[in-house]
């Protein structure tokens, strides 16, 4: 579907990106791209970042149980 990119083509693409965004923005672009890929992979694997340790238990429930004990 896509033509194979050789080293020359990749260098030209990199030069265009540097000209458009500037060298100072490249680390920010790379970090944003990495975070996007990571979140995309997590969404496919079904992982959630915020999983409670016990289903249905909240911090207020745990606090009230600790006061009763």
Curated annotation (Swiss-Prot):
Record-level GO BP terms: protein transport by the Tat complex
UniProt keyword terms in alphabetical order: Cell inner membrane, Cell membrane, Membrane, Protein transport, Translocation, Transmembrane, Transmembrane helix, Transport
GO terms for MF: protein transmembrane transporter activity
Coiled coil segments of this chain: none
Localisation: Cell inner membrane
Functional description taken from the UniProt entry: Part of the twin-arginine translocation (Tat) system that transports large folded proteins containing a characteristic twin-arginine motif in their signal peptide across membranes. TatA could form the protein-conducting channel of the Tat system.
Subunit and partners: The Tat system comprises two distinct complexes: a TatABC complex, containing multiple copies of TatA, TatB and TatC subunits, and a separate TatA complex, containing only TatA subunits. Substrates initially bind to the TatABC complex, which probably triggers association of the separate TatA complex to form the active translocon.
Protein name according to UniProt: Sec-independent protein translocase protein TatA
Name of the gene: tatA
């Amino acid at each position: 579907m896509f033509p194979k990119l050789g080293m020359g083509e990749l260098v030209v693409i990199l030069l265009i990106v540097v000209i458009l965004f500037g060298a100072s923005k490249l680390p920010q672009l790379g970090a944003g791209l990495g975070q996007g890929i990571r979140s995309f992979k997590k969404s496919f694997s079904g992982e959630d970042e915020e999983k409670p340790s016990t289903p249905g238990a909240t911090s207020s429930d745990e606090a009230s149980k600790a006061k009763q004990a």
